[in-house]
């Protein structure tokens, strides 16, 4: 499942609406990437959304 391990952003659910206001179910998925970070001095791999990645909420391992 696409879920950010930093902010817990996950798939959200709702409806698509046509011009006639017919409702069909749809999902919105977060833009999640798998990166390596430094956690307590050791590198580990996490799934993080691009919003958290851009705002430097984690230290990226190079």
Curated annotation (Swiss-Prot):
Q: Which Pfam families match?
A: Ribosomal_L28
GO CC annotation = ribonucleoprotein complex; ribosome
Query: Sorted alphabetically, which NCBIfam families does this protein's record hold?
Result: L28
Q: Where are the transmembrane segments?
A: none
Q: Which family does it belong to?
A: Belongs to the bacterial ribosomal protein bL28 family.
Name the UniProt key words of this record, in alphabetical order: Ribonucleoprotein, Ribosomal protein
Question: What gene codes for this chain?
Answer: rpmB
Q: Which SUPFAM superfamilies match?
A: L28p-like
| Methyltransferase is among the record's keywords | no
Origin species: Ruminiclostridium cellulolyticum (strain ATCC 35319 / DSM 5812 / JCM 6584 / H10) (Clostridium cellulolyticum)
Q: What is the lineage of its organism?
A: Bacteria, Bacillati, Bacillota, Clostridia, Eubacteriales
Gene3D superfamilies associated with the record? Ribosomal protein L28/L24
Which protein are we looking at?
Large ribosomal subunit protein bL28
Q: Which GO terms describe its molecular function?
A: structural constituent of ribosome
Q: Which GO terms describe its biological process?
A: translation
